[in-house]
């Protein structure tokens, strides 16, 4: 008589125990777990039981649903955000999580579509809903003025999005930058002049002509010419333009930890310099640097007689 094999069904696990175990796994792996991880940790649990437990945790707002290159990820939800997303469906939670992960640099709707794999019409609907709840906000990026990036409502946009102190309503403040450029150079020139008038030996004069970026920053702040708060990084950006113009040179010295203006035991020092050789006339004239010089000829669309650069130079 042939032996009859009887398949033994595993006993039904307590749904609460399954949910608690999934929560424990999420705490062990804060960056998220896949369904395969849950299956490996609980091999005796049927797929349907896992799905029921996961869906219940998602509906209660205890888990976040993410999408990665390897598939779906489940991550423990921040308790502060759990109340914000109460009553939202899984698709809305997924979009919110993608925007949250983007931080203060924001994310375009096209990238949200790619990461969520949702239709664009559905994404636009979700974005409007989240904006109406003041959970997210749309910010125009200086990198692409016609495109908006989305970020959490309470975040301050990154400098790469707003352009920092040099932009106002997505417009580059060229006059403001020029004023800062002039004032920074004026301060360094004054420092160099004071060093020359001291009648010390050349080495002491040279060392005395240097100023740290913190000194320049403090001088600009005391002038009160800026309506926005400038950082030392902003001032160093201006000083770098002076270096590129050949008006200023920079040196880096070692500094004690905690010294004002030092970073990682180093300090940047700047001083005004004079050009070694005066520029020749052809370089100073617009023709010497004109980008359309080869196309310029009398009777043509570009000609010396209607050159706007030459007119401006002569008036100057």
From Swiss-Prot:
Its main location: nucleus. One of its GO terms (molecular function) is double-stranded DNA binding. The keyword Amino-acid biosynthesis does not apply. Coiled coil: none annotated. GO terms for biological process: defense response to virus; innate immune response; positive regulation of innate immune response; positive regulation of interferon-beta production; transcription by RNA polymerase III. Disulfide bonds: none annotated. [4Fe-4S] cluster binds at residues 287, 290, 296, 307. There is a cross-link at residues 5, 7 (Glycyl lysine isopeptide (Lys-Gly) (interchain with G-Cter in SUMO2)). The modification N-acetylalanine is found at residue 2. Keywords: Acetylation, Antiviral defense, DNA-directed RNA polymerase, Immunity, Innate immunity, Iron, Iron-sulfur, Isopeptide bond, Metal-binding, Nucleus, Transcription, Ubl conjugation. DNA-dependent RNA polymerase catalyzes the transcription of DNA into RNA using the four ribonucleoside triphosphates as substrates. Specific peripheric component of RNA polymerase III (Pol III) which synthesizes small non-coding RNAs including 5S rRNA, snRNAs, tRNAs and miRNAs from at least 500 distinct genomic loci. Part of POLR3C/RPC3-POLR3F/RPC6-POLR3G/RPC7 heterotrimer that coordinates the dynamics of Pol III stalk and clamp modules during the transition from apo to elongation state. This is DNA-directed RNA polymerase III subunit RPC6. It comes from Mus musculus. The lineage of its organism: Eukaryota, Metazoa, Chordata, Craniata, Vertebrata.
